[in-house]
Structure formats: structure tokens, C-alpha cells
């Protein structure tokens, strides 16, 4: 087992690991002390560890996206756990999922467990089903805290469905295209005309990163948000992503959308983007069903 960090949480984690019979418990530090048997992050990659537990604040809100260990180079990993609970999935957890690690879990459930057992202590009574209580509270918190992001082709109904769904779920509605316009002071066609698609995508990624790390939101995303890999990573760190799948013949041509100015352009765009949309885990068959 590898434990990242050398603070108080490391000490607790190490004690539990040894108590549960871990064959080896190795400590990883940015400034390793060889006399204490500590490893650098570079050395840790070749440790042969089966389990990694992060006890550092790396990747914690608001400094999301930080990851010190390259888990993709550790093929024997069976589990990665991160004590950080905000965002729901740190960069470490996202990378572990991408690397196919069987178990990759953030720290929210641990936070809830601490609260449940602290409540038992202070109230001087035991819950009838502490484990079940932890699971129920964790699920309720996750439903409340996580974002819902809607993706799909231009004019697929993301804004319309998004506003209705935000009201239903009690989440704040955010239209990322509107936020781009608000921040830049120009319309989307004007941004395209002045800076091209690359310029627009950079602004889109900046607004995605800004809002995706927050919580309790319904995010209506631009149709091309899936063209930048970092956008999907940002959306997944703190939410569920839904694809609104509207039939091609029901989509609107033009309407101030620079990349869908003709039927042929729309068909070509749909052919290019559909495989990217379908890579996601959650799909809504149609805006009406959503």
C-alpha cells in the first residue's frame, strides 16, 4: 500500500492499514526522508503497490486538477482512494478511472462516516444501522451537491430542458454560452469572426473550468464542448453528464450558430460529434424523455 502524504491523516491511515494486515505500507512525500524509508513520487510509480491512498490536499477545491502521482504507469493497482471530498472526483480519481483501476473512490463517504460515528459518541448511543445510515446520507449529499451537465447538438433543447430540470432538481441554471458572452462582451458570432473557432473554444474551456468546479448547478453546455478533452474532465469531476439526443431532422439550421449555418454543415457536424457524445455513460434518448 502507498500512502501519499506525511500528516495526521497519513498516520491514521497507516495504523489502520497495518491493523488490517497490509503486507507493506509505504509513505510517499514531496521531500522524502530516506532514513524513514519514504519514497519520492517518481519512485512510487515503480513500487508495485496494489492500493494508493491520498492523504494530501492535492486536487482539493478550489485548486482542482492537481495530481502528483501518475497512476497510469502503475498497472498492478487494484484501488485508489482519496480523502479529498471536494470535488467529488479529484484529478487522481479521474486518472485512476481512465487507467481502468477497479476501485477509485473519493472522500465524501469517509467524511460522512466521521460525522456518524462522532454523533454516536456525543449522543452516547449507537445507530441501529450505522453503515446503512452512512450510505443513505452520502447518497443524499451527492444528489444535492453534484452538478448535472447537458450536452448535445446545437438546438437539441439543452437550454429549454435545462431550465425545467434545474427547477425540478432545485439547482442553479447556468448557460455556458451565455456566460462566455457575458465575460467577453461580444456575441458568439462576433467572437468567431474575430478569433475563429480556436479562440472561442479557449473561452469556452475557461468558463467550463470556472463553473464545473462549483456545485448544485444545472449546466447547459455548448454543442462543441466535447471537442476539448479537458472540458469533459472538468464536467465529470463534480457532476453527471447527460447527452440530449435529438433527431437530426429536428435540429435548427442557422439561428446565430456559426458552425451550423446549413443543413450539410449540420449533418457533417453530427457525424463528427456523435461518437464523442456516445462515449459518455449517461444518455437521454430525447429532450422530451428528459
Task: Describe each model-derived feature in a short phrase.
Residues 178-236:
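ATP-dependent small-molecule kinase phosphotransfer cores
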Residues 158:
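Conserved lysine of the Walker
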Residues 36-104, 225-231:
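Rossmann-like adenosine-cofactor binding region
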Residues 237-276:
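A glycine- and Lys/Arg-enriched "phosphate-lid" helix/loop adjacent to the NTP-binding pocket
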Residues 20-35:
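NAD(P)-binding Rossmann-fold cofactor-contacting core
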Residues 1-17, 152-154:
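Glycine-rich adenosine-cofactor-binding loop
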Residues 282-287:
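Conserved small/polar residues in nucleotide/adenosyl-binding loops
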Residues 83-145:
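Adenosine-phosphate binding glycine-rich loop
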